[in-house]
From Swiss-Prot:
Major location (coarse): plastid
Pfam families noted in UniProt: RNA_pol_A_bac, RNA_pol_A_CTD, RNA_pol_L
Protein name per its UniProtKB record: DNA-directed RNA polymerase subunit alpha
Keywords: Chloroplast, DNA-directed RNA polymerase, Nucleotidyltransferase, Plastid, Transcription, Transferase
Organism: Elymus canadensis
EC identifiers of the protein: 2.7.7.6
Region of interest: Alpha N-terminal domain (alpha-NTD): 1-233
Region feature (Alpha C-terminal domain (alpha-CTD)): 266-339
Protein family: Belongs to the RNA polymerase alpha chain family.
UniProt KW Nucleotidyltransferase keyword: yes
Enzymatic reactions: RNA(n) + a ribonucleoside 5'-triphosphate = RNA(n+1) + diphosphate
Name of the gene this protein is made from: rpoA
One of the record's GO cellular component terms: DNA-directed RNA polymerase complex
GO terms for biological process, alphabetical: DNA-templated transcription
Amino acid sequence: MVREEVAGSTQTLQWKCVESRVDSKRLYYGRFILSPLRKGQADTVGIALRRALLGEIEGTCITRAKFGSVPHEYSTIAGIEESVQEILLNLKEIVLRSNLYGVRDASICVKGPRYITAQDIILPPSVEIVDTAQPIANLTEPIDFCIDLQIKRDRGYQTELRKNYQDGSYPIDAVSMPVRNVNYSIFSCGNGNEKHEILFLEIWTNGSLTPKEALYEASRNLIDLFLPFLHAEEEGTSFEENKNRFTPPLFTFQKRLTNLKKNKKGIPLNCIFIDQLELTSRTYNCLKRANIHTLLDLLSKTEEDLLRIDSFRMEDRKHIWDTLEKHLPIDLLKNKLSF
Protein backbone atom coordinates (compact mmCIF):
# COMPACT_ATOMS: atom_id res chain seq x y z
CA MET A 1 0.00 0.00 0.00
CA VAL A 2 1.34 3.40 -1.03
CA ARG A 3 0.14 6.80 0.12
CA GLU A 4 1.00 9.97 -1.79
CA GLU A 5 -0.05 13.62 -1.94
CA VAL A 6 -1.44 14.79 -5.29
CA ALA A 7 -3.32 17.81 -6.48
CA GLY A 8 -6.84 17.61 -7.85
CA SER A 9 -10.47 17.31 -6.87
CA THR A 10 -13.60 15.39 -7.74
CA GLN A 11 -17.17 16.24 -6.86
CA THR A 12 -19.11 12.99 -6.75
CA LEU A 13 -18.15 9.49 -5.64
CA GLN A 14 -17.35 7.39 -8.71
CA TRP A 15 -15.20 4.51 -9.85
CA LYS A 16 -13.44 4.01 -13.15
CA CYS A 17 -11.20 1.47 -14.88
CA VAL A 18 -8.11 3.45 -15.92
CA GLU A 19 -6.07 0.57 -17.34
CA SER A 20 -6.83 -2.93 -18.61
CA ARG A 21 -4.58 -5.35 -20.42
CA VAL A 22 -4.05 -9.03 -21.18
CA ASP A 23 -0.42 -10.01 -20.58
CA SER A 24 -1.06 -13.67 -21.43
CA LYS A 25 -3.89 -16.20 -21.46
CA ARG A 26 -3.35 -16.74 -17.73
CA LEU A 27 -2.52 -13.20 -16.65
CA TYR A 28 -5.01 -10.33 -16.84
CA TYR A 29 -4.41 -6.92 -15.29
CA GLY A 30 -6.78 -4.11 -14.35
CA ARG A 31 -6.33 -0.78 -12.54
CA PHE A 32 -9.28 1.04 -10.99
CA ILE A 33 -9.86 4.26 -9.07
CA LEU A 34 -12.54 5.22 -6.56
CA SER A 35 -12.95 8.84 -5.44
CA PRO A 36 -13.54 11.10 -3.62
CA LEU A 37 -13.29 9.42 -0.22
CA ARG A 38 -13.02 11.01 3.19
CA LYS A 39 -9.81 10.58 5.13
CA GLY A 40 -9.51 6.98 6.32
CA GLN A 41 -12.21 5.61 4.03
CA ALA A 42 -9.75 4.61 1.31
CA ASP A 43 -7.93 2.31 3.74
CA THR A 44 -11.21 0.78 4.88
CA VAL A 45 -12.39 0.08 1.34
CA GLY A 46 -8.95 -1.01 0.13
CA ILE A 47 -8.40 -3.55 2.91
CA ALA A 48 -11.91 -5.00 2.61
CA LEU A 49 -11.74 -5.33 -1.17
CA ARG A 50 -8.27 -6.84 -1.11
CA ARG A 51 -9.34 -9.53 1.37
CA ALA A 52 -12.54 -10.24 -0.55
CA LEU A 53 -10.71 -10.45 -3.88
CA LEU A 54 -8.08 -12.85 -2.57
CA GLY A 55 -10.30 -15.02 -0.37
CA GLU A 56 -13.94 -14.76 -1.44
CA ILE A 57 -13.85 -15.22 -5.22
CA GLU A 58 -14.81 -18.70 -6.39
CA GLY A 59 -12.78 -20.65 -8.92
CA THR A 60 -12.96 -24.00 -10.69
CA CYS A 61 -10.13 -26.50 -10.64
CA ILE A 62 -9.23 -30.18 -10.79
CA THR A 63 -9.43 -31.76 -7.32
CA ARG A 64 -8.82 -35.47 -7.97
CA ALA A 65 -7.21 -37.75 -10.54
CA LYS A 66 -7.57 -41.50 -10.98
CA PHE A 67 -4.86 -43.38 -12.86
CA GLY A 68 -5.93 -46.97 -12.30
CA SER A 69 -3.49 -49.45 -10.78
CA VAL A 70 -0.80 -47.07 -9.55
CA PRO A 71 0.67 -48.02 -6.15
CA HIS A 72 1.52 -44.47 -5.01
CA GLU A 73 1.91 -40.93 -6.32
CA TYR A 74 5.70 -41.24 -6.60
CA SER A 75 5.38 -44.12 -9.05
CA THR A 76 6.44 -43.97 -12.66
CA ILE A 77 4.35 -45.31 -15.51
CA ALA A 78 6.05 -47.15 -18.35
CA GLY A 79 6.06 -45.06 -21.51
CA ILE A 80 5.49 -41.74 -19.71
CA GLU A 81 8.30 -39.29 -19.08
CA GLU A 82 6.76 -37.73 -15.96
CA SER A 83 6.09 -39.41 -12.63
CA VAL A 84 2.56 -39.55 -11.21
CA GLN A 85 3.43 -36.72 -8.82
CA GLU A 86 4.61 -34.49 -11.68
CA ILE A 87 1.41 -35.17 -13.60
CA LEU A 88 -0.64 -34.25 -10.51
CA LEU A 89 1.28 -30.98 -10.17
CA ASN A 90 0.65 -30.19 -13.84
CA LEU A 91 -3.07 -30.90 -13.41
CA LYS A 92 -3.13 -28.59 -10.41
CA GLU A 93 -1.94 -25.71 -12.63
CA ILE A 94 -4.73 -26.10 -15.20
CA VAL A 95 -6.92 -22.97 -15.23
CA LEU A 96 -10.63 -23.56 -15.86
CA ARG A 97 -13.53 -21.19 -16.41
CA SER A 98 -17.08 -22.22 -15.51
CA ASN A 99 -20.31 -21.41 -13.68
CA LEU A 100 -20.80 -24.94 -12.39
CA TYR A 101 -21.50 -25.78 -8.76
CA GLY A 102 -20.87 -29.08 -7.08
CA VAL A 103 -18.61 -31.82 -8.44
CA ARG A 104 -18.29 -32.75 -12.12
CA ASP A 105 -16.35 -35.48 -13.91
CA ALA A 106 -13.82 -35.08 -16.71
CA SER A 107 -11.29 -37.36 -18.35
CA ILE A 108 -8.23 -37.73 -20.54
CA CYS A 109 -7.85 -40.69 -22.90
CA VAL A 110 -5.09 -40.58 -25.53
CA LYS A 111 -2.68 -42.86 -27.36
CA GLY A 112 1.07 -42.18 -27.55
CA PRO A 113 3.58 -41.23 -28.52
CA ARG A 114 2.55 -37.59 -28.11
CA TYR A 115 2.44 -34.66 -25.72
CA ILE A 116 -0.65 -34.36 -23.54
CA THR A 117 -1.88 -30.81 -22.97
CA ALA A 118 -4.94 -29.25 -21.38
CA GLN A 119 -6.64 -29.39 -24.77
CA ASP A 120 -6.90 -33.18 -24.39
CA ILE A 121 -9.14 -32.94 -21.31
CA ILE A 122 -12.72 -34.01 -22.07
CA LEU A 123 -14.84 -31.57 -20.05
CA PRO A 124 -18.55 -31.18 -19.25
CA PRO A 125 -20.31 -28.54 -21.41
CA SER A 126 -20.29 -25.90 -18.66
CA VAL A 127 -16.49 -25.88 -18.29
CA GLU A 128 -13.84 -24.46 -20.59
CA ILE A 129 -10.05 -24.32 -20.50
CA VAL A 130 -8.36 -20.92 -20.35
CA ASP A 131 -5.02 -22.03 -21.81
CA THR A 132 -5.23 -25.20 -23.89
CA ALA A 133 -1.43 -25.33 -24.28
CA GLN A 134 -0.74 -26.04 -20.60
CA PRO A 135 1.39 -29.23 -20.43
CA ILE A 136 0.30 -32.37 -18.58
CA ALA A 137 2.56 -35.25 -19.67
CA ASN A 138 4.71 -36.65 -22.46
CA LEU A 139 3.97 -40.14 -23.79
CA THR A 140 7.19 -41.54 -25.23
CA GLU A 141 5.79 -44.90 -26.36
CA PRO A 142 2.67 -46.10 -28.23
CA ILE A 143 0.60 -46.73 -25.11
CA ASP A 144 -3.02 -46.02 -24.20
CA PHE A 145 -3.21 -43.56 -21.33
CA CYS A 146 -6.42 -42.61 -19.49
CA ILE A 147 -7.09 -40.47 -16.42
CA ASP A 148 -10.44 -39.87 -14.72
CA LEU A 149 -10.66 -36.38 -13.25
CA GLN A 150 -12.88 -34.65 -10.72
CA ILE A 151 -13.67 -30.94 -11.09
CA LYS A 152 -15.07 -28.71 -8.38
CA ARG A 153 -15.90 -25.04 -7.92
CA ASP A 154 -14.83 -23.64 -4.56
CA ARG A 155 -12.92 -20.78 -2.98
CA GLY A 156 -9.52 -20.45 -1.34
CA TYR A 157 -6.90 -23.16 -0.89
CA GLN A 158 -8.26 -26.64 -0.18
CA THR A 159 -5.99 -29.42 1.07
CA GLU A 160 -6.81 -33.09 1.55
CA LEU A 161 -5.08 -35.67 3.67
CA ARG A 162 -3.03 -38.08 1.60
CA LYS A 163 -4.63 -41.52 1.76
CA ASN A 164 -3.81 -44.78 0.07
CA TYR A 165 -6.86 -44.99 -2.20
CA GLN A 166 -7.34 -48.53 -3.46
CA ASP A 167 -9.00 -47.37 -6.68
CA GLY A 168 -5.88 -45.50 -7.80
CA SER A 169 -7.27 -42.00 -7.28
CA TYR A 170 -5.24 -39.19 -5.77
CA PRO A 171 -6.43 -35.87 -4.30
CA ILE A 172 -5.01 -32.64 -5.70
CA ASP A 173 -4.58 -29.65 -3.40
CA ALA A 174 -6.99 -27.27 -5.09
CA VAL A 175 -6.18 -23.58 -5.47
CA SER A 176 -9.58 -22.01 -6.20
CA MET A 177 -8.26 -18.47 -6.38
CA PRO A 178 -8.84 -16.69 -9.71
CA VAL A 179 -7.24 -13.51 -8.34
CA ARG A 180 -3.46 -13.85 -8.31
CA ASN A 181 -2.58 -10.57 -6.62
CA VAL A 182 -4.13 -7.32 -5.41
CA ASN A 183 -2.45 -4.04 -4.58
CA TYR A 184 -3.93 -0.70 -3.57
CA SER A 185 -2.54 2.78 -3.13
CA ILE A 186 -4.01 5.94 -1.64
CA PHE A 187 -3.53 9.48 -2.93
CA SER A 188 -4.50 12.54 -0.88
CA CYS A 189 -5.98 15.54 -2.69
CA GLY A 190 -6.94 19.09 -1.79
CA ASN A 191 -6.11 21.35 1.13
CA GLY A 192 -7.55 21.94 4.58
CA ASN A 193 -11.23 21.03 4.88
CA GLU A 194 -11.35 20.21 1.16
CA LYS A 195 -8.92 17.33 1.58
CA HIS A 196 -10.02 13.90 0.36
CA GLU A 197 -8.55 10.61 -0.83
CA ILE A 198 -8.43 8.65 -4.07
CA LEU A 199 -8.14 4.86 -3.95
CA PHE A 200 -6.20 3.11 -6.72
CA LEU A 201 -6.78 -0.65 -6.92
CA GLU A 202 -4.68 -3.03 -9.03
CA ILE A 203 -5.93 -6.56 -9.74
CA TRP A 204 -4.19 -9.48 -11.45
CA THR A 205 -6.25 -12.58 -12.37
CA ASN A 206 -5.47 -15.98 -13.89
CA GLY A 207 -7.72 -15.48 -16.92
CA SER A 208 -10.75 -17.36 -15.63
CA LEU A 209 -12.17 -13.96 -14.65
CA THR A 210 -11.34 -10.47 -15.84
CA PRO A 211 -10.26 -7.99 -13.13
CA LYS A 212 -13.54 -6.13 -13.63
CA GLU A 213 -15.57 -9.32 -13.11
CA ALA A 214 -13.52 -10.15 -10.01
CA LEU A 215 -14.07 -6.66 -8.58
CA TYR A 216 -17.80 -6.94 -9.17
CA GLU A 217 -18.03 -10.37 -7.50
CA ALA A 218 -15.94 -9.26 -4.51
CA SER A 219 -18.14 -6.18 -4.07
CA ARG A 220 -21.31 -8.27 -4.19
CA ASN A 221 -19.88 -10.72 -1.66
CA LEU A 222 -19.10 -7.87 0.73
CA ILE A 223 -22.61 -6.47 0.33
CA ASP A 224 -24.16 -9.89 0.98
CA LEU A 225 -21.97 -10.26 4.06
CA PHE A 226 -23.53 -7.19 5.69
CA LEU A 227 -27.13 -7.79 4.60
CA PRO A 228 -28.12 -9.64 7.82
CA PHE A 229 -27.34 -6.52 9.86
CA LEU A 230 -29.51 -4.38 7.57
CA HIS A 231 -32.38 -6.88 7.69
CA ALA A 232 -32.21 -7.05 11.49
CA GLU A 233 -32.49 -3.25 11.69
CA GLU A 234 -35.37 -3.11 9.22
CA GLU A 235 -37.31 -5.76 11.12
CA GLY A 236 -36.62 -4.04 14.43
CA THR A 237 -35.74 -7.27 16.20
CA SER A 238 -33.18 -7.66 18.93
CA PHE A 239 -30.63 -10.42 19.31
CA GLU A 240 -32.64 -12.08 22.07
CA GLU A 241 -35.76 -12.08 19.91
CA ASN A 242 -33.87 -13.55 16.97
CA LYS A 243 -32.23 -16.19 19.17
CA ASN A 244 -35.56 -17.59 20.33
CA ARG A 245 -37.41 -17.10 17.08
CA PHE A 246 -39.19 -20.14 15.70
CA THR A 247 -38.80 -20.83 12.00
CA PRO A 248 -42.21 -21.80 10.58
CA PRO A 249 -42.77 -24.55 8.04
CA LEU A 250 -41.60 -23.70 4.56
CA PHE A 251 -44.06 -22.41 2.00
CA THR A 252 -44.33 -24.17 -1.36
CA PHE A 253 -43.62 -22.36 -4.57
CA GLN A 254 -46.21 -24.55 -6.26
CA LYS A 255 -48.90 -22.73 -4.26
CA ARG A 256 -47.48 -19.43 -5.39
CA LEU A 257 -47.64 -20.58 -9.00
CA THR A 258 -51.30 -21.55 -8.57
CA ASN A 259 -52.17 -18.22 -6.99
CA LEU A 260 -50.21 -16.33 -9.60
CA LYS A 261 -52.12 -18.03 -12.41
CA LYS A 262 -55.45 -17.32 -10.71
CA ASN A 263 -54.71 -13.65 -10.12
CA LYS A 264 -52.72 -12.82 -13.24
CA LYS A 265 -53.74 -15.19 -15.99
CA GLY A 266 -52.23 -13.00 -18.67
CA ILE A 267 -48.68 -12.92 -17.31
CA PRO A 268 -46.27 -14.78 -19.65
CA LEU A 269 -44.20 -16.38 -16.90
CA ASN A 270 -41.71 -17.91 -19.31
CA CYS A 271 -40.88 -14.42 -20.63
CA ILE A 272 -39.97 -12.97 -17.23
CA PHE A 273 -36.32 -13.72 -16.53
CA ILE A 274 -34.86 -13.82 -13.03
CA ASP A 275 -32.36 -11.19 -14.18
CA GLN A 276 -35.26 -8.72 -13.99
CA LEU A 277 -36.11 -9.48 -10.34
CA GLU A 278 -33.26 -7.52 -8.71
CA LEU A 279 -32.06 -10.53 -6.75
CA THR A 280 -28.78 -10.46 -4.86
CA SER A 281 -25.86 -11.98 -6.74
CA ARG A 282 -25.78 -14.87 -4.27
CA THR A 283 -29.45 -15.80 -4.76
CA TYR A 284 -29.21 -15.20 -8.51
CA ASN A 285 -26.18 -17.50 -8.83
CA CYS A 286 -27.90 -20.22 -6.77
CA LEU A 287 -30.87 -20.20 -9.15
CA LYS A 288 -28.75 -20.01 -12.29
CA ARG A 289 -26.67 -23.04 -11.39
CA ALA A 290 -29.92 -24.99 -10.97
CA ASN A 291 -30.93 -23.97 -14.52
CA ILE A 292 -33.66 -21.65 -13.23
CA HIS A 293 -33.75 -18.84 -15.78
CA THR A 294 -37.35 -17.60 -15.86
CA LEU A 295 -40.13 -16.92 -13.40
CA LEU A 296 -41.91 -20.02 -14.67
CA ASP A 297 -38.84 -22.12 -13.85
CA LEU A 298 -38.75 -20.63 -10.35
CA LEU A 299 -42.41 -21.01 -9.49
CA SER A 300 -42.47 -24.56 -10.85
CA LYS A 301 -39.94 -25.65 -8.24
CA THR A 302 -40.94 -27.14 -4.92
CA GLU A 303 -39.38 -26.08 -1.64
CA GLU A 304 -37.36 -29.29 -1.52
CA ASP A 305 -36.03 -28.67 -5.02
CA LEU A 306 -34.67 -25.27 -4.01
CA LEU A 307 -33.16 -26.42 -0.75
CA ARG A 308 -31.27 -29.14 -2.60
CA ILE A 309 -29.39 -26.44 -4.54
CA ASP A 310 -25.84 -26.15 -3.25
CA SER A 311 -25.41 -23.11 -0.94
CA PHE A 312 -29.13 -22.18 -1.06
CA ARG A 313 -30.08 -20.82 2.37
CA MET A 314 -33.20 -19.84 4.28
CA GLU A 315 -32.23 -16.21 3.71
CA ASP A 316 -32.36 -16.80 -0.04
CA ARG A 317 -35.87 -18.21 0.29
CA LYS A 318 -37.04 -15.12 2.17
CA HIS A 319 -35.31 -12.83 -0.30
CA ILE A 320 -37.07 -14.52 -3.23
CA TRP A 321 -40.42 -14.20 -1.43
CA ASP A 322 -39.91 -10.49 -0.72
CA THR A 323 -38.74 -9.81 -4.27
CA LEU A 324 -41.74 -11.53 -5.84
CA GLU A 325 -44.10 -9.63 -3.56
CA LYS A 326 -42.43 -6.39 -4.58
CA HIS A 327 -42.58 -6.97 -8.32
CA LEU A 328 -45.78 -8.98 -8.70
CA PRO A 329 -48.98 -7.15 -7.65
CA ILE A 330 -50.88 -10.24 -6.57
CA ASP A 331 -52.77 -11.10 -3.43
CA LEU A 332 -50.65 -13.71 -1.69
CA LEU A 333 -50.93 -12.39 1.86
CA LYS A 334 -53.40 -15.05 2.88
CA ASN A 335 -50.76 -17.69 2.19
CA LYS A 336 -47.81 -15.75 3.59
CA LEU A 337 -46.04 -17.04 6.66
CA SER A 338 -44.33 -14.75 9.14
CA PHE A 339 -40.52 -14.65 9.11
